[in-house]
Design a protein with these regions (language model features):
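Extended ligand-binding clefts on enzyme/binding-domain cores
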Residues: 189-217, 235-237
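Outer-membrane beta-barrel pore domains
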Residues: 45-47, 210-364
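Outer membrane beta-barrel
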Residues: 23-42, 47-160, 166-203, 286-288, ...
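Bacterial Sec-dependent N-terminal signal peptides
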Residues: 1-24
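Hydrophobic alpha-helical membrane context
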Residues: 14-18, 69, 363
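A short, polar/proline- and glycine-enriched secondary-structure boundary/capping micro-motif
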Residues: 83, 111-112, 162, 268-271, ...
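Short hydrophobic/aromatic segments of transmembrane alpha-helices and their interfaces
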Residues: 3-4, 54, 131-132, 240, ...
Length: 364
């Protein structure tokens, strides 16, 4: 871990010096970390749901800045495994434009702006898990000025971080973009509309006959204590994937609404029918204590409430991964949730979540 951090900082310094050797800047390094502790009680006919407690995420890392450059290295630990999280360098071209290169979460809809520990529903909506990508090696250009926010990304598949190219056999790639218009982004007055789109080639699969000719999509039940698959669709004979998601934020005073719709299509080879899936979620938020909701330009979304705030969140998610025309039945998911968030201080959050999840029309 020490060697990885040193390499990231060294790369940052090297790039800064090459671009402008005469620029007088100060190197600033700040440690980062996170601990997520969770406990849950379950009622289900599925024996895989066992009551318990867990530490599903622990992080340690470092952020560095030098002039117009920033870098981040983040290492995660969960259930006996160490994994690389954010590893990137970014160059600030102006107060409203930057380029980021490395392994990170690329912008695709509202949920891509917040980390896994900052989801207001405690667990991210199942539709986002099913149709979104996690961290990917690539480059992303960001434009963030006044009423407009836009990103453009190119990337390779997620397995590129874990396996050498000869082990992959082939490397999948893709591109995505997020465009947002936000005419109201003042404290207590929020309104935002946006749309994201993406294109991908088939991904790695350990089964040789499916390797880079398929997509394996799905989502777990909304808990990290017991990891149980809720919906899952394996789409063979795939040529490429396209998807898009419109988004909306509306807020007045201490009340706000967030919503997204997802559409995904896998174009397939030969005479196989294309696979189509969709989903949506809506989140109604209210601050019982803490004043009005504020806007975060950096996240392109609602800012984290102030310390001492108490928030109630009602959520509904629908995910449809069963397509009768292509004869792929990944399942249909309905989830209703209620979450209470208490923002203890700048560094600590206490959450309580109750949810009811139902799965239908799934084969396998």
């Amino acid at each position: 871990m020490k060697n990885l951090i040193s390499l990231g900082v060294f790369l940052l310094i090297l790039l800064s010096v090459q671009v402008n050797a005469q620029e007088q800047s100060v190197l600033k390094i700040r440690p980062t970390g996170r601990i997520l502790m969770d406990g849950g009680l379950f009622h289900s006919d599925n024996k895989n749901f066992v009551d318990g407690v867990a530490i599903p995420d622990a992080r340690i890392g470092v952020k560095a800045t030098y002039g117009k450059y920033k870098a981040k290295v983040d290492i995660g630990y969960a259930y006996g495994k160490v994994s690389l999280k954010d590893i990137f360098v970014e160059r600030q071209f102006s107060s409203y434009a930057l380029l980021r290169v490395g392994n990170f979460v690329h912008q695709f809809g509202l949920q891509s702006s917040t980390s896994s520990s900052m989801k207001v529903t405690m667990e991210e909506p199942a539709s986002n898990e099913a149709f979104f990508n996690s961290r990917l090696i690539g480059a992303m250009f960001v434009y963030d000025k006044n009423d407009f926010f836009g990103t453009a990304s190119v990337h390779v598949e997620s397995e590129a971080l874990k396996k050498k190219s000869n082990e992959l056999g082939k490397m999948g790639y893709g591109a995505m973009s997020r465009l947002v218009y936000r005419p109201l982004h003042d404290t207590g007055r929020l309104f935002q509309l946006g749309i994201s789109g993406a294109y991908e080639t088939p991904r790695y699969n350990s089964e040789p006959t499916l390797n880079h000719t398929s997509f394996d999509l799905g989502a777990n039940f909304p808990t990290r204590i017991a990891k149980v698959r809720a919906v899952n669709a394996l789409i063979p004979d795939a040529k490429n994937l396209i998807k898009f998601t419109p988004e909306m934020i509306a807020g007045y005073g201490p009340v706000a609404l967030e919503a997204q719709y997802y559409y995904l299509q896998v174009n397939r080879k030969k005479d196989f029918k294309n696979y189509k899936a969709s989903g949506m979620y809506g989140i109604l938020r209210g601050l019982l204590i803490g004043g009005n909701y504020r806007y975060s330009h950096t996240d392109c979304g609602i800012a984290t409430p102030d310390s001492g705030s108490l928030e109630c969140v009602f959520g509904y998610n629908y995910t449809d991964m069963s397509d009768t025309r292509s004869h792929i039945y990944g399942g249909r998911l309905n989830d209703v949730s209620f979450t209470v968030n208490y923002y203890i201080n700048k560094y600590m959050i206490w959450r309580f979540r109750y949810s009811y999840t139902k799965i239908t029309d799934r084969v396998g």
